[in-house]
Amino acid sequence: MNLLYLGLLLFVTLLTTLYLASSKAIFAFSDWTFHAARVEEIYLNLKSGSFFTFIAARTFHNTGAASFLFYPYIFFYPWAFLRFILSPVNAFYAWYALVTFATATISYFSMKAYSKKSLASFIFSLVYTFAPYRLYLGGAVFGEYLAVIFLPLLFLGIYEVLWGDKKKWYLLAISGALVAYAHILSVFLSLEFAVILFIIKLITSRGISKDRIKSLLLSAGVCVFLVLPVIVPFFTDFIGQGLSSAKPSISYTMGPRYLLLNSFSAQKGWKLSFMLMLTILTAWAFIKSRRNWIIYGLGLFACFLTTRYFPWKLTAGTPFEMVQLTARYLSYASLFLTILLALGSSSVLEEHVTGRKKLALSCSLAVFMALFSLSSLSVYRDTLKHVQDMPKTSANSTQPAPFKRLRDYNYYNQFNYKILFGAFDYMPKSSLTSVQKQNSLLMHQAYLNGKTLTLSPLIKANQISYQVKSEKAADVDLPVIAYKHTTVSVNGQKHAFRRGNRGTVVVGLKRGQNTVTVGYKASPVFYLSIVISILSWLALLIYLVKFKAKYAQ
């Protein structure tokens, strides 16, 4: 049955993706320009022969912003590689299909390992993968979108360590690492629920065995080794460097009425599906086991966290403000409530359906979910029909990127606009103290001998060069951010520099024409972390092969 169900999941994936791709356009809203610029930088660096990307030399207005150092991007490589064989729009939708099918497949096998039921796993995968909130994330919010792929595997790992087979600790290590490589904030959100589950374990089991504690610590330790390349830059380049990050604040919460009523509408967005809302209203009537009551409680609590009735004001000044948008908890609400929906509905169906009827039912469920998803995506398609194309603007424009339509012929127009959300993330705080400073970076303005110069950058991978002519020896303040491992050369010779009041590179020049090149050279510790991480993944793979062989005996 696995092949049948995976085939049906692939069918729904392709149908929904082709429905979007047939528009031959993309709606650039929310975080789209931030992530699209990162993918463009990776693609252009790959094209020039550089595999690693550290700073934004070609995008982000050539400011050298280091969002690549502090925001994981490994899962964007498939999108970047697809750019070599497909047009920009088609490359995105091909990547979108890959992510969707990966979500469906991991969801299916995670639920199969938990429930041991194929039909329940199929229903879970369908409802979870094509949930309205996940469809919304797939339009632009790609950090969360990628993290959602691995949440079912992550909570399967937590279950195995705390209640199931503790020898499967590796599931938690692997899934935790994959979430970290997708979206750091999702690691924090997942830890919240992991702590709740740990407390529930202590209460319901009146403690926890030493073996389970060992498995928990082992999975955490291995996970750290697996994600060292994500962790190390924070220690080598972020801590103590006066850099900014995404602004911590709770900027939006929903009312219960909004969540309830909005969930019964067809379109994608910040909501649950009507199926999950019905699960909330009816699940209590058929839940029998303590385990399912716990899952139900977690689903309700996740919904509660999205609303303004949770005392979010009390979190001011705490790490919990990193959540920013409480709608992020909808991914967790969808996960827990979909487990109940899948278990309950599959039990009822399997009592009355066998043989060929089961095949017909499975196909019908796939068609229903495909139609439901197409209905959810129809508003997006309608938007693409009526919104205007993104117009051209100057290369150093300070105008925020508008919510407009992108096609292959105007795809590159977006990179000349100021990125709407995240343009100044991970820059020195000193560069953000005024709009004038921010705009001076976007407009490539340098300061020399009391004069303002507008310079044109010469770009290579992780490297920005400027031609600067000075009438006398003087310091030049370039529109490129200075980090701990920034490198500077003048006329081909390594040169000392300091950080200016904009957080930018300031370097002393001799009289005459000078070529100043600003680059980034990662710490040797970073490359060591990559080696350790790769060896850890290989060691874990060898362990799994031996473990499976021993387990099979």
Which residue ranges define each predicted feature?
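Start-transfer (signal-anchor) and selected internal transmembrane alpha helices
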Residues: M1-L18, L540-Q553
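Hydrophobic alpha-helical membrane-interfacial segments at the cytosolic entry of transmembrane helices
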Residues: L8-L9, I208-V232, I294-F301, V367
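Active-site lumenal/periplasmic loops and adjacent helix-entry segments of GT-C-fold
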Residues: L15-Y114, L119-P152
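Membrane-interface transmembrane helices that cradle and orient dolichyl/undecaprenyl
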Residues: L154-K168
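Membrane-interface alpha helices of multi-pass inner-membrane proteins
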Residues: G157, W169-I184, S219-F225
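Perimembrane helix-loop-helix junctions
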Residues: S190-A220
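Hydrophobic, aromatic-rich transmembrane alpha-helices
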Residues: F225, L272-Y296, L300-F301
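Active-site-proximal, structured, solvent-exposed surfaces of multi-pass membrane proteins
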Residues: K429-Q553
